[in-house]
């Protein structure tokens, strides 16, 4: 088995007359934390959205686990083994933390969300298993004591953790995190870093978009940098940190 989990080749994306991505190629290896950084408007979120099926690509191809990834929709991408969180938290506020995770888990069930409503014996047994798994994931991210709380009543940091738990419920091979530290205080950011390090320790591959450059440089195994839709660097943090193009485009002194 190759150690490359995701390979993007010459990805292009236009919005009207704007070339948002220009022949971007990169590789993400199994079991690593891969960071994607760059200034505002560099194309990070666009590339992220291409990988997760929100945007169709205008050129290039994506290989995932050795097979072409069609990227037809977020559902097909999730079924292939890629889960994501969003910069703007997207939870069901009127559902409990446990219920939010259970919704994510239904992607991997035989019955699906609607089948569970029928409540046959098989569906009831499966629903009980989903509930147990949801509780395990809430414990994993450290908010099992809030399982019965409505998502809207959780603290901001706990909502971030809940979104990660829901993504993990789909059993992804690749977890894509979009600005997970945004809005967090210093204590919450430390906890987030420990959680992501735990994911890597347990063998999960993580793609991280994050404006907190120090977090990225201290956490990621490798980092790619985009600028004006082009990749200008891809290497281990120490090499990227000292790259003159990167310093000029984005980092300045913030990575030191």
List where the protein language model places each region.
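Glycine-rich phosphate-binding loops of nucleotide-dependent enzymes
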Residues: 2-256
């Amino acid at each position: 088995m190759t150690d490359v989990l995701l390979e993007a080749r010459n990805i292009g994306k236009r919005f009207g007359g704007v070339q948002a991505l220009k022949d971007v190629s990169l590789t993400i290896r199994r079991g690593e934390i891969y960071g994607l950084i760059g200034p505002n408007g560099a194309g990070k979120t666009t590339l992220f959205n291409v990988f997760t099926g929100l945007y169709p690509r205008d050129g290039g191809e994506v290989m995932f686990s050795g097979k072409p990834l069609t990227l037809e929709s977020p559902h097909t991408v999730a079924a292939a083994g890629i889960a994501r969180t969003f910069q703007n938290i997207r939870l069901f506020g009127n559902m409990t933390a446990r219920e939010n995770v259970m919704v994510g888990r239904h992607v991997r069930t035989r019955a699906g969300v609607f089948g569970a409503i029928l409540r046959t014996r098989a569906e009831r047994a499966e629903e009980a298993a989903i509930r147990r798994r949801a509780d395990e994931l809430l414990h994993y991210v450290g908010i099992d004591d809030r399982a019965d709380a409505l998502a809207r009543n959780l603290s901001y940091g706990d909502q971030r953790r809940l979104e990660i738990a829901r993504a993990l419920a789909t059993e992804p091979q690749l977890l894509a995190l979009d600005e997970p530290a945004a809005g967090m205080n210093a204590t919450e950011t430390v906890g987030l870093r420990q959680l992501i390090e735990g994911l890597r320790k347990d063998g999960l591959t993580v793609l991280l978009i994050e404006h907190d450059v120090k977090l990225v440089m201290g956490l990621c195994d490798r980092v790619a940098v985009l600028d004006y839709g082009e990749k200008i660097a891809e290497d281990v943090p120490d090499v990227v940190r000292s790259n003159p193009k990167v310093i000029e485009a984005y980092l300045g002194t913030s990575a030191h």
